[in-house]
Amino acid sequence: MTPLDAKRPLQLNDQGQLRHFLSLDGLNRELLTEILDTADSFLEVGARAVKKVPLLRGKTVCNVFFENSTRTRTTFELAAQRLSADVITLNVSTSSASKGETLLDTLRNLEAMAADMFVVRHGDSGAAHFIAEHVCPQVAIINGGDGRHAHPTQGMLDMLTIRRHKGGFENLSVAIVGDILHSRVARSNMLALKTLGCPDIRVIAPKTLLPIGIEQYGVKVYTDMTEGLKDVDVVIMLRLQRERMQGGLLPSEGEFYRLFGLTTARLAGAKPDAIVMHPGPINRGVEIESAVADGPHSVILNQVTYGIAVRMAVLSMAMSGQTAQRQFEQENAQ
């Protein structure tokens, strides 16, 4: 267990409800299932003529992204708007943070504007935990991705994708392929799959892109694509994160594709009804062949759709948990 994992009680209020969403570590199957069930119920909102429910009316959600993002930032904005929240998205490149203002000073200024929730993406592992410890406890913190550590909403939208296409987790074989070492998505997915009862979790990567101690996640490790993909139900491809790499981990992107790229021929070794997933952005011809990314096995665009519903679920549940905690503290202070 890492020091980051030891901080997991921060996420829950005294009634065991979600109040922050920082990591999937330490959250039990019942809570993860509640998130999935709540997200399922929100999917129909996207099909309405008026795509709104009033659950966060009068609340303010601030998106504070210190790393670039398209899908995550946009889907969080849409999720908050569909819950009727007021939404502020901070452009860090043009904010005072670019002039040397610290992370906490930036957030405390937003807190002083009566924000109710921060969605934070940051390049440092543990940033979301740090913020949850040091801002006003009445502000809910949602981790939009922190360094290599965690991307919990991506993990949950991947779980919703799998559940909706496969019905459950108890009899599945799932392969996670690519840059495991630098991937917060891989870590969140491994934790979620284990918690939800998936019996066969595989990781496939070159040895240089496997983290030390990965066996603690209860996964089977493969360094050969043909062997690792044999009879799997789900293939989750990961982007090569060159921006987090130091030299020498890979000879070239072409060599990686030759050995670990998902091609139609390699996918034939999986089950005939296998699904292919990718958190995006996709590097075609590096980790995945276009014919696979756009083919009948791909559910990549479904992931984006499900991501809005999952983020609606997390925002609404965390806000509800914060409200319940304030009421609990007020009652016990009397």
Curated annotation (Swiss-Prot):
EC number of the protein: 2.1.3.2
GO biological process: 'de novo' pyrimidine nucleobase biosynthetic process; 'de novo' UMP biosynthetic process; amino acid metabolic process
Residue sites binding carbamoyl phosphate per the record: 71-72, 121, 151, 154, 280-281
Main enzyme class: transferase
Protein residues bound to L-aspartate: 99, 184, 239
Gene Ontology CC terms: cytosol
Protein name (database record): Aspartate carbamoyltransferase catalytic subunit
SUPFAM superfamilies listed in its UniProt record: Aspartate/ornithine carbamoyltransferase
Pathway: Pyrimidine metabolism; UMP biosynthesis via de novo pathway; (S)-dihydroorotate from bicarbonate: step 2/3
Function summary: Catalyzes the condensation of carbamoyl phosphate and aspartate to form carbamoyl aspartate and inorganic phosphate, the committed step in the de novo pyrimidine nucleotide biosynthesis pathway.
PANTHER family recorded: ASPARTATE CARBAMOYLTRANSFERASE (PTHR45753:SF6), ORNITHINE CARBAMOYLTRANSFERASE, MITOCHONDRIAL (PTHR45753)
Signal peptide: none
UniProt GO molecular function: amino acid binding; aspartate carbamoyltransferase activity
Gene source species: Pseudomonas fluorescens (strain ATCC BAA-477 / NRRL B-23932 / Pf-5)
Family statement drawn from the similarity comment of this UniProt entry: Belongs to the aspartate/ornithine carbamoyltransferase superfamily. ATCase family.
Keywords: Pyrimidine biosynthesis, Transferase
Domain of life, per lineage: Bacteria
Catalytic activity as recorded in UniProt: carbamoyl phosphate + L-aspartate = N-carbamoyl-L-aspartate + phosphate + H(+)
Coiled coil location: none
Subunit structure: Heterododecamer (2C3:3R2) of six catalytic PyrB chains organized as two trimers (C3), and six regulatory PyrI chains organized as three dimers (R2).
